[in-house]
Swiss-Prot record:
The modification N6-succinyllysine is found at residues 71, 77, 94, 100. It comes from Bos taurus (Bovine). NADP(+) binds at residues 12-36. GO terms for molecular function: 6,7-dihydropteridine reductase activity; NADH binding; NADPH binding. This is Dihydropteridine reductase. Homodimer. One of its GO terms (cellular component) is cytoplasm. The gene is QDPR. The active site is at residue 148. SUPFAM superfamilies: NAD(P)-binding Rossmann-fold domains.
Length: 242
């Protein structure tokens, strides 16, 4: 079962060197939790690291990460696996970069989410939490960012599939996808300096949301697609209609 209230937790952060992943590592280490980062680069603040090897083969990458996480954890179980890996690339169906960007989005979102889901079947405690990184935009068509929309829609479908009884997740475990609009990250501020930052979601809000869900406070039901909408600096979570 998941740890009792007040106990130190054990968490895997897939994408632990990204903007949101780094904040998660910092915040949970500050609570004296054991936090492992899975990313293409080490996070020195993490308790442990699994460095992902870049490859064009999904099976190679999946096997490498699965094997190294298995060696790291042994028989130990974790309270949560937070998949916060991802990225963004635009382009419509006519774009010269369509194939390249679709490939990139698939690697950054679908590969990472699929590997995280498999890790959950092996290493997540009963009653544990798996979060996936969806996108509110992918609830509808995304003609200006075809690859991004397809990849995020696949993540949404994966999350809903994991809620099924025969999904392979441990008893009582929950898979939940967060569907933000725009996160307030340094990269986004640099690329969109004229944007309305009051409509962007602060990373700290998501970190605290993860903390609540890990400790089973206001945790949504498994399979939920949770929209994250920030308006005039106020962020609200609402479940997307099935």
């Amino acid at each position: 079962m998941a740890a009792a209230a007040g106990e130190a937790r054990r968490v895997l952060v897939y994408g632990g060197r990204g903007a949101l992943g780094s904040r998660c590592v910092q915040a949970f280490r500050a609570r004296n939790w054991w936090v492992a980062s899975i990313d293409v680069q080490e996070n020195e603040e993490a308790s442990a690291n699994v460095v992902v090897k870049m490859t064009d083969s999904f099976t190679e990458q999946a096997d490498q990460v699965t094997a190294e996480v298995g060696k790291l954890l042994g028989t130990e179980k974790v309270d949560a696996i937070l998949c916060v890996a991802g990225g963004w690339a635009g382009g419509n169906a006519k774009s010269k970069s369509l194939f390249k960007n679709c490939d990139l989005m698939w690697k950054q979102s679908v590969w990472t989410s699929t590997i995280s889901s498999h890790l959950a079947t092996k290493h997540l405690k009963e009653g544990g939490l798996l979060t996936l990184a969806g996108a509110r935009a992918a609830l509808d068509g995304t003609p200006g960012m075809i690859g991004y929309g397809m990849a995020k829609a696949a993540v949404h479908q994966l999350c809903q599939s994991l809620a099924g009884k025969s999904s392979g997740l441990p008893p009582g475990a929950a898979a939940v996808a967060l569907l933000p609009v725009t996160l307030d990250t340094p990269v986004n501020r640099k690329s969109m300096p004229e944007a309305d930052f009051s409509s962007w979601t602060p990373l700290e809000f998501l970190v605290e949301t993860f903390h609540d869900w890990i400790t089973e406070k206001n945790r949504p039901s498994s399979g939920s697609l949770i929209q994250v909408v920030t308006t005039e600096g106020k962020t609200e979570l609402t479940a997307a209609s099935p």
